[in-house]
Amino acid sequence: MNHYLHELIHTQKNILFLQGPVGPFFKKVAEWLKKSGCNVYKINLNGGDEYFYSKNSVSFCKSVEKFPQFLQDYIYQHSIDAIIVFGDCRIYHKIAKSIADSNPNLSFWVFEEGYLRPHYITFEKDGVNGFSLLPKNHDFYENIGITSIDKSNGKSHYYSMIRYSVIYYIFMLLKKYKYSNYIHHRKTSLSFYASHWVLALIRRLKSKLIEPRLIKNVINNEHKPFYIFPLQCNQDFQIQEHSPYHSMKSYIFRVICSFSLFADEKSYLLIKHHPMD
């Protein structure tokens, strides 16, 4: 990430932000880039975007079919040489990536929640996840030679994330009249998110009572050997765009069937629930 940030601030002058994660993260990154000598611009696509980044920004309120021309005109008018987004599979970001791919003077940068979590952020050029330029050869990672990673002292921001999400979706709904043509990449019903966050909170509290003992057993090798099977959010683009599965349910079914057929009978399958699902 440091390599890409260094390249960004030393080679790009006029930077355009599209959608970021819910909360003030993009605003803070923009302030840091300004201090580094960059000119920063922002296009808001809904009321949530506008709430967290209202100053020095413009709103796009037309249909998505008109976004390519709008974006190309904006890039030309402001001499944009870099676009920064959060996630590269949202429909507006796909359009931006397509424009960047056809323009040798325009670079495309993507933030994503860390491949390693907690306490890490992913930032790559040209794409993340399935579009990442990272090597996909298993041997590359086997030969890196890293035996341990320093433990971060960062604090959990789980409840801040919930607060930002609620604020974001409230303002998305409140300004729906302004951004009536906006197409969101996920379900936008506030009741949908509220009910699922409540269920997730209950599950989280329950896990705090049960999991410590189970984790201790794993650490003490009472379930050895074991294989970790980390789950993804059901609506995540890793599943929707970069996998042959239509849902986590089908993915789990496939892994369990395979494990039962081919794993050693003394092995354990440790399924890790996604913290944001």
Which residues does each PLM region occupy?
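N-terminal subdomain of nucleotide-sugar transferases
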Residues: 1-46
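Active-site and donor-binding regions of nucleotide-sugar-utilizing enzymes
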Residues: 18-28, 45-141, 277
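Conserved catalytic-core segment of nucleotide-activated headgroup transferases in glycan assembly
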Residues: 36, 182-276
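Active-site-proximal region of nucleotide-activated glycan assembly enzymes
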Residues: 107-203
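Short, compositionally biased "basic patch" segments
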Residues: 31-53, 221-231
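Conserved acidic residues
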Residues: 13, 79-81, 225
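Hydrophobic anchor at the start of a short beta-strand
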Residues: 40-41, 108, 267
